[in-house]
Amino acid sequence: MNINDILKKLINKSDLEIDEAEELAKAIIRGEVPEILVSAILVALRMKGESKNEIVGFARAMRELAIKIDVPNAIDTAGTGGDGLGTVNVSTASAILLSLINPVAKHGNRAVSGKSGSADVLEALGYNIIVPPERAKELIHKTNFVFLFAQYYHPAMKNVANVRKTLGIRTIFNILGPLTNPANAKYQLMGVFSKDHLDLLSKSAYELDFNKVILVHGEPGIDEVSPIGKTFMKIVSKRGIEEVKFDVTDFGISSIPIDKLIVNSAEDSAIKIVRAFLGKDEHVAEFIKINTAVALFALDKVSDFKEGYEYAKYLIENSVNKLNEIISLNGDLTKLKTIMVKSSG
């Protein structure tokens, strides 16, 4: 593969084939391409607009080069991040609820543009985010929950970290996280930062051997199920891709004021989650339940979103004990108790 020829092709706004993209991604991730060319390629891809084949090729490369673990029938709630609204980390809270009934391999990283990525909030709750593969299998067996820290499970990505930081713009790597779970999770609720990317990412997911993925983008521009209005969805399964629109009132509840969901830090997010689990923050609790409802539908545990919401109401009642179990087996209960104390007021 001639990198300069690839660059010329991208500058001419020609899309790469899947195999070309996969080979290119492997070379970049392994550190075989000079940084100045990596920068040029990432910018050219962004300016052209990443194609489905390019995303699939890059995702396959990242999956192949990742540290892998086997977690049958797992679900992930990782999204793209980057919506910039700074809401409470609902995907992590939903993952904890889901682990009451199904294996959860939560893939995630530190915050992209929000105040609290999944790694940040789990650390604030006392969780040890560096979990080696053998330990990960043990935790899944004992608790149905493990966090797979992207920086640990994709070690070769350090070869592009400097370029990405220097560029300071979104690149193709920002949208690959949800498609590259090291446990090869077959089920997923995937928040998407832009409505315009739903179609592209759903078509990419269809090529990547998932059983069922629900991609969501909600009003007012949030990479979650909308707390205030419509959620635009793509449901990806072996049968194809279905487009769905769903309103928060279809759950039988009123809209949730977005300002009640904003956080200032990872600790603030952790406190809001614990308060919701304790029944002390109804707004955040509702936000967690509506997102969990859609994840339950992705798992085929319920027949529709309304039934998923009713199931989520039951799960959140058992969430505090589950959180204690998760932290006690892989974390610092003292930190969790500190959050609990701050949440009790």
UniProtKB/Swiss-Prot annotation:
Anthranilate 2 binds at residue 164. Mg(2+) 1 binds at residues 91, 224. Its cofactor is Mg(2+). It is an enzyme of class 2 (transferase). Mg(2+) 2 binds at residues 223-224. 5-phospho-alpha-D-ribose 1-diphosphate binds at residues 79, 82-83, 87, 89-92, 106-114, 118. Catalyzes the transfer of the phosphoribosyl group of 5-phosphorylribose-1-pyrophosphate (PRPP) to anthranilate to yield N-(5'-phosphoribosyl)-anthranilate (PRA). It catalyses: N-(5-phospho-beta-D-ribosyl)anthranilate + diphosphate = 5-phospho-alpha-D-ribose 1-diphosphate + anthranilate. GO terms for cellular component: cytosol. This is Anthranilate phosphoribosyltransferase. Anthranilate 1 binds at residues 79, 109. It comes from the Archaea. Coiled coil: none annotated. Keywords: Amino-acid biosynthesis, Aromatic amino acid biosynthesis, Glycosyltransferase, Magnesium, Metal-binding, Transferase, Tryptophan biosynthesis. Binds 2 magnesium ions per monomer. One of its GO terms (molecular function) is magnesium ion binding. InterPro entries: Anthranilate_Pribosyl_Tfrase, Glycosyl_Trfase_fam3, Glycosyl_Trfase_fam3_N_dom, Glycosyl_Trfase_fam3_N_dom_sf, Nuc_phospho_transferase. Homodimer. Belongs to the anthranilate phosphoribosyltransferase family. Its EC number is 2.4.2.18. It comes from Saccharolobus islandicus (strain L.S.2.15 / Lassen #1). Pathway: Amino-acid biosynthesis; L-tryptophan biosynthesis; L-tryptophan from chorismate: step 2/5. GO terms for biological process: L-tryptophan biosynthetic process.
